[in-house]
């Protein structure tokens, strides 16, 4: 896992519930946490971000003037004050837990107090069309490198080095994986279903991409063809170039999918082609919002104008989202208090979406 936080960038089953709905495709809920130490400049900064699919819905920053769990999507604002008080308290407690973990890991690696260090965690669940758990995950990084991760069996750990093995032994003694599994199979999926219902107009939509091909001469002999996909949701999309029907994957420059700033995404794929041979190249676009895949060619008589303003806005939002795409801590033990709204289960009403307790220190 790769990270950044403030200045560094992170590039890291409820069987008893009677199911009355199904969802198209799979959906996910993820939490991303980052803690960054800054010697001589106060306590470490702690940031947490929650996502349902590709939509950010909550945010917490310990550096805020009055740190609170904050809504980042209209549909989450309907949760009652008990929800926000509970989530705020969990995030504040986690901020302290991560400060302790930063001290512990600095000791494990025999590092001085002078440098800045980062802990990241990402956890969450993927849910299938039947509303049940597809997979759960929990991953940790330290200073941008893998540290420890929960295996796919949700009962064992993979430690990256001898320092991480110290954490592994602590967590095995505390039976931490069992608690995580209970959260991932139960509470996580229940809250995800609740959020998908409450935010179905936005979370379960499929906006097709607006597509075009642009032409950029490099020299008298070569030009770049760039295939654009703009304004689509969800983020999953496939762009491929072909020459006379043969894939040009190895010769394609493909950027990561980027947020556009309006709750949609953008992406492009480019190939360098010999001048005069542009019509031998086709761009192929596949997305959930399209009734069938698109095939595009460059049209010399109608050179497309690139919507620069939207792309620049998307890059600005990307900087914010990348800070938000930081990795996370799981809180798994259940406790009953709070939560309004939702009709799926008592657990979803009483337990925190993040889990109801703070995580163990590393």
Curated annotation (Swiss-Prot):
Predominant localisation class: membrane
Low complexity: bias regions: 343-362
Keyword vocabulary terms for this entry: Disulfide bond, Glycoprotein, Immunity, Membrane, MHC I, Signal, Transmembrane, Transmembrane helix
Taxonomy, superkingdom: Eukaryota
Subcellular localization: Membrane
Any one Gene Ontology BP term: antigen processing and presentation of endogenous peptide antigen via MHC class I via ER pathway, TAP-independent
Record-linked InterPro entries: Ig-like_dom, Ig-like_dom_sf, Ig-like_fold, Ig/MHC_CS, Ig_C1-set, MHC_class-I_related, MHC_I-like_Ag-recog, MHC_I-like_Ag-recog_sf
Region (Alpha-1): 25-114
Residues covered by the Ig-like C1-type domain: 209-295
Signal peptide bounds: 1-24
Pfam families referenced in this protein's UniProt entry, alphabetically: C1-set, MHC_I, MHC_I_C
Family: Belongs to the MHC class I family.
PANTHER family: HLA CLASS I HISTOCOMPATIBILITY ANTIGEN, B ALPHA CHAIN, MHC CLASS I-RELATED
Protein name as it appears in the record: Patr class I histocompatibility antigen, B-2 alpha chain
Biological source species: Pan troglodytes
């Amino acid at each position: 896992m790769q990270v950044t936080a403030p200045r560094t960038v992170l590039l890291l089953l409820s069987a008893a519930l009677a199911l009355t709905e199904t969802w198209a495709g799979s959906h996910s809920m993820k939490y991303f946490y980052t803690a960054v130490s800054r010697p001589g400049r106060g306590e470490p900064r702690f940031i947490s971000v929650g996502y349902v699919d590709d939509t950010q819905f909550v945010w917490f920053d310990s550096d805020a003037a009055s740190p609170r769990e904050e809504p980042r999507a209209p549909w989450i604002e309907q949760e009652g004050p008990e929800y926000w008080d509970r989530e705020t308290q969990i995030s504040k407690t986690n901020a302290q837990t991560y400060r302790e973990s930063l001290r512990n890991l600095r000791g494990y690696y025999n590092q001085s107090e002078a440098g800045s260090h980062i802990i990241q965690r990402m956890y969450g669940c993927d849910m299938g069309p039947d509303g049940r758990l597809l997979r759960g995950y929990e991953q940790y990084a330290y200073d941008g490198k893998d540290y420890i991760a929960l295996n796919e069996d949700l009962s064992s750990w993979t430690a990256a080095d001898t320092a991480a093995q110290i954490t592994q032994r602590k967590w095995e003694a505390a039976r931490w994986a069992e608690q995580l599994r209970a959260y991932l199979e139960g509470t996580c999926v229940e809250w995800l279903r609740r959020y998908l219902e409450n935010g179905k107009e936005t979370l379960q939509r499929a906006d097709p991409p607006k597509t075009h091909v642009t032409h950029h001469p490099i020299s008298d002999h070569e030009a770049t063809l760039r295939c654009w996909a703009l304004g689509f949701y969800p983020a999953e999309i496939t762009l491929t170039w072909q020459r006379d029907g043969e894939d040009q994957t190895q010769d394609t420059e493909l950027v990561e999918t980027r947020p556009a700033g309006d709750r949609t995404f953008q992406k492009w794929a480019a190939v360098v082609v010999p001048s005069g041979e542009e019509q031998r190249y086709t761009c192929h676009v596949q997305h959930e919002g399209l009734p069938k895949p698109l095939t595009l060619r460059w049209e010399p008589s109608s050179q497309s104008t690139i919507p620069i303003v939207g792309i620049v806005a998307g890059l600005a939002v990307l900087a914010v989202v990348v800070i938000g795409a930081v990795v996370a801590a799981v809180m798994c033990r259940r406790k009953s208090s709070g939560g309004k709204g939702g009709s799926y289960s008592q657990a979803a009403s009483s337990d925190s979406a993040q889990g109801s307790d703070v995580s163990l220190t590393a």
